[in-house]
Amino acid sequence: SLGLPLGACASAGAKPTEGRFDFEQVSAIARALAAKPYQPPRTIESAALDRVDYDMIQKIRFQPAKALWAGTDSPFTVQFFHLHQGVKQPVRIYVVEDGRSRELRYRRDMFSYGDAELAKALPADLGFAGFRVMNPNGETDWLAFQGASYFRTAGAEDQYGLSARGIAIDTAVPGKAEEFQLFTAF
């Protein structure tokens, strides 16, 4: 959930609910997920999304005026990443304010597409690929989560270290497939 301070609910298939939000709720979600078989997250199947390649995603821009906490006294804003052909599994974004959570829904008008036909062709409930927390200057981010498991953060000098996965299991074990978590809800 996005709140001040920022915390992530990062579990496969997490389905937080709107309303009261606290650590007990996160624990209950984790217990419920652990008690049932794994179900892969929803993948968006869309011919329009299939067209959003590397070059095209560089042209799709989040509108800074639509950022979470834009126009408030918060020193940070949160911008969102658009889905594309490399990231087709949306993450759910929840905002926690005054101890209550609410889901933040994707809207086309949050992005500048540069291609009006593409914007119209994309599903209305597309979802987000992830988010980034912007520095007070609004020009650079200091934390980003995108896709199933990618994240990065900058240090005190605003320099990124290595990009990373949240956790990886059996990365060098012969005969075993690598496993890693999926970020599905924040």
Model-predicted regions and their roles:
Residues 1-13:
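N-terminal export signals
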Residues 31-176:
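Solvent-exposed N-terminal domain segments of exported/luminal and surface proteins
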Residues 16-34:
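Short N-terminal segments immediately surrounding and downstream of signal-peptide cleavage
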Residues 4, 15, 36-40:
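Intrinsic-disorder/low-complexity coil detector
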Residues 181-186:
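Short, intrinsically disordered, charge-balanced linker/junction segments flanking boundaries
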